[in-house]
Amino acid sequence: QGTVMKIETERQASVTILTPAVRRLDASVAVAFKSAIAQEIGEAPGDLIVDFSEIDFIDSSGLGTLVSLMKMMNGRGEMTLCALNPGIRNMFTLTRMDRIFRICEERTSALAQLNE
């Protein structure tokens, strides 16, 4: 099933900011999400921010996709997540993913940390 993932892309110096235009990051979009972001990782070396401001829900498929994307980033730059809603933030805490991923409140703080 060919789900197309719309992702807004912005570049600031060596940082690529990706904002997936999807409400639910779950099994139905995980493959499309992964391939779209993997393509961005391949095209733009450097640090990556995934902006969750449009995402309301994430499940284990979405989390697994983020882990595999982080592995792809290995050696290419840092991957930071920002603008997680309280429910998603809680999911990261419960699964201890908050220890694996760098998470910032908003895009500006994520950019500031990456530019340190």
Predicted regions and their residues:
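Amphipathic alpha-helical interaction surfaces in cytosolic regulatory modules
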Residues: 24-101
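A short, charged, amphipathic alpha-helix used as a generic interaction element across diverse proteins
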Residues: 114-116
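Short beta-strand/loop segment at the start of cytosolic alpha/beta domains
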Residues: 1-18
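Flexible glycine-/small-residue-rich
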Residues: 20-22
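Acidic phosphotransfer microenvironment of two-component signaling modules
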Residues: 86, 108-109
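Short acidic-hydrophobic, aromatic-tinged amphipathic segments that line or gate anion-handling sites
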Residues: 102-106
